[in-house]
């Protein structure tokens, strides 16, 4: 009986050692598997992050496309506010392309729509200035009217005048007014001298010169 009990105890201890060893091996395998899975998860996460960075990287091409998108959206909103549509936008682009070909035509925004405005060349400005000078010279030769003022019949042709020629015309007009004032002052002084001379002559005529009576000799 004692031998049987001893054998049973020894067998139980062996079974316990085997179970402990198997449990340790299982725990080690489980730990290694968890470590491997963690490494795999980290690797997959880093791969996903790198792919996301590649997709969201800001390049020059994306920057240019973004700017084009902003420009087109701004133009669409502008024309929607102005009451225009896509057809007007295409027409505007055609008008702008044609306006660059013409040297004297410019496209401006007036009353909510694009319009062509013709600006005259420098030759038209020269013609206008020469016409103004011609009328000014002819005005000097014209007599005064009943009120003592000169009659101005100058007409400026053309819708748009050059800025420089306008300044020149204003300066010429100012000089002309000064010349008119000087001429009027000269005429007034001449009239006064003429009146003074007339008064002197009338006084001379009205003077009574005493005449000595000479008695004849007998």
From Swiss-Prot:
Expression triggers: Regulated by the circadian clock at warm growth temperatures as direct targets of CCA1, with highest levels from noon to dusk. Repressed by CCA1 at the transcription level via chromatin binding and in a temperature-dependent way. Induced by cold. Induced by abscisic acid (ABA). Transcription is repressed by blue and red lights, but induced by darkness; by contrast, present at low levels in darkness but accumulates in blue light (at protein level) due to transcription auto-repression.
Composition-biased stretches (Low complexity): 20-37
Residue ranges of the TM segments: none
Protein location: Nucleus
Record GO biological process: negative regulation of DNA-templated transcription; regulation of circadian rhythm; regulation of photoperiodism, flowering; response to abscisic acid; response to absence of light; response to blue light; response to cold; response to red light
Gene Ontology CC terms: nucleus
Region described as Disordered: spans on this chain: 1-51, 166-218
Compositional bias segments (type: Basic and acidic residues): 186-207
Phenotype of the disrupted gene, per the record: Period lengthening of various circadian output rhythms and affected central clock gene expression. Derepressed expression of circadian-regulated and cold-responsive genes. Delayed flowering under long days conditions, and slightly in short days. Increased freezing tolerance.
Residues spanning the signal sequence: none
Alphabetical UniProt keywords: Biological rhythms, Nucleus, Repressor, Transcription, Transcription regulation
Protein function: Together with COR27, involved in central circadian clock regulation and in flowering promotion, by binding to the chromatin of clock-associated evening genes TOC1, PRR5, ELF4 and cold-responsive genes in order to repress their transcription. Negative regulator of freezing tolerance.
PANTHER family attached to this UniProt entry: COLD REGULATED PROTEIN 27, COLD-REGULATED PROTEIN 28
Full protein name: Cold-regulated protein 28
Organism: Arabidopsis thaliana (Mouse-ear cress)
């Amino acid at each position: 009986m004692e031998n049987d009990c001893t054998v049973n105890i020894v067998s139980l201890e062996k079974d316990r050692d085997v179970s402990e060893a198997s449990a340790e091996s299982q725990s080690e395998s489980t730990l290694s598997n968890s470590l491997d899975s963690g490494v795999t998860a980290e690797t997959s996460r880093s791969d996903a992050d790198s792919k996301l960075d590649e997709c969201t990287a800001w390049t020059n091409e994306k920057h240019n496309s973004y700017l084009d998108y902003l420009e087109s959206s701004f133009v669409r909103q502008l024309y929607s506010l102005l009451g225009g549509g896509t057809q007007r936008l295409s027409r505007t682009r055609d008008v702008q392309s044609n306006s660059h070909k013409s040297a004297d035509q410019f496209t401006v925004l007036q009353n909510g729509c694009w319009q062509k405005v013709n600006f005259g060349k420098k030759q038209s400005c020269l013609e206008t200035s020469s016409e103004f000078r011609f009328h000014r010279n002819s005005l000097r030769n014209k007599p005064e009217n009943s009120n003592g003022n000169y009659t101005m019949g100058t007409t400026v042709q053309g819708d748009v005048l050059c800025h420089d020629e306008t300044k020149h015309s204003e300066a010429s007009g100012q000089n002309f007014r000064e010349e008119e004032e000087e001429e009027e002052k000269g005429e007034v002084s001449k009239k006064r001298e003429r009146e003074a001379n007339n008064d002197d002559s009338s006084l001379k005529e009205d003077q009574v010169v005493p005449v000595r009576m000479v008695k004849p000799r007998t």
